[in-house]
Amino acid sequence: MRTINNNILYLICLMPPALVAGPFVADSFVVIINFLFFYAIFKTKKYEYFKHKFFILFLIFYFVFIISSLNSENIFFSLKSSLPYFRHGVFSLAIIYTIDQNKDKFLKIFFRILLITFSVLTFDGLFQYFMGFNIVG
């Protein structure tokens, strides 16, 4: 169980560079984190995370999206764009779960990776401004 929690922790902490890398990498991280989170929750039987007030508020908001999609002219097109939002609510629960499990380690790793990501992007932006081409892409 500890390795699953560590995997969730490191994947969440690697989200800033994943967002820089592109939407495919970031969305893949979110999906993997969600699967690991569901596995950890069902293995430890900690279902109270699904009763969290944030998640209930998200579910209400999500069902408003679904009902609004069902009232549109093109139901399939509307549902296609609103159904995948569920993964973001579960991702938020995974972040809450990770912070509850090991807050100090999470904050330490996350802010170091965030600092490195911002430093690389700042250096790349300055390099691109003065040299005319960028390094990162």
List the model feature ranges, each with a label.
Residues V90:
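Phosphate-binding glycine-rich loops of NTP-binding sites
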Residues M1-K80, Y97-L115:
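Transmembrane signal-anchor hairpin modules in multi-pass inner-membrane enzymes, especially those
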Residues D27, F86-R87:
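Extracytoplasmic catalytic/substrate-binding loops of multi-pass membrane glycan-assembly enzymes
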Residues V120-G137:
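Membrane-interfacial helix-loop-helix modules of multi-pass inner-membrane proteins that assemble, modify
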Residues R87, F111-D124:
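Transmembrane alpha-helices of multi-pass, membrane-embedded glycan-processing enzymes
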